[in-house]
Amino acid sequence: MFKMKYLIYQITNIINGKIYIGAHATLDENDGYMGSGVNIKKSIKKYGIHNFKKEILYSFSSSEEMYKMEALLVNEEFVMRTDTYNAAIGGRGNPVIVHLQDPSYRNMLSIRTKEGMTVEAKRKISKAKTGVKQSDETIAKRVKGRNEYYKTHVHPRKNKPISISHRKAISEKLGGIKKFIPICIKGVKFDNPDYAAEHFKVSPKTIRNWINADDMPDCYRIK
């Protein structure tokens, strides 16, 4: 009888040395799964899967143990490194993940609002989506669209320094001082990705995607 395995794996680009660490539940360690992150998928498409190697770092008997280890390994410092593909902090073991594995639940969430839909119907759909994280594919499409736009348009906040009062306002809004992780986004320096996200009115994950993207040289971590 097959037994579910809860794995922490690492994928390495043998050309540039960049790595991706993820969590995966499977009955077969050799199922060919190569991650779901936006950046790693883009890189595999660019370099070819033959230029990547995968190794199992840990194997657990429960998802709780797996996600706990992922949280320890894939922390904020890790995702901000220039040699990693991870854009999201690890440790996502929560009930939402379980629900999203149910096809009927996913279909229900993907219902698009149609013209003439009643207010009550819209309310029910909104309620169903509350607290549910968007898929990597959805986020990737939004990020791609935004990036394409700013290839031909100047971001209104590009190269605009942050005043002391603005820094203070952002810090207060984000709940105080954040861990020091110096980065530069579109000509503006920040002490933490959260500050950059607030300044550019995007999510922290989008900031990490910008930093890890090969086609955005003006977004990087300051060493």
Swiss-Prot record:
Its cofactor is Mg(2+). SUPFAM superfamilies: DNA-binding domain of intron-encoded endonucleases, GIY-YIG endonuclease. Keywords: Endonuclease, Hydrolase, Magnesium, Nuclease. InterPro entries: GIY-YIG_endonuc, GIY-YIG_endonuc_sf. Residues 4-87 form the GIY-YIG domain. PROSITE patterns: GIY_YIG (PS50164). GO terms for molecular function: endonuclease activity. SMART domains: GIYc (SM00465). Its EC number is 3.1.-.-. To endonucleases of group I introns of fungi and phage. Probably involved in the movement of the endonuclease-encoding DNA. This is Putative endonuclease segD. It comes from Enterobacteria phage T4.
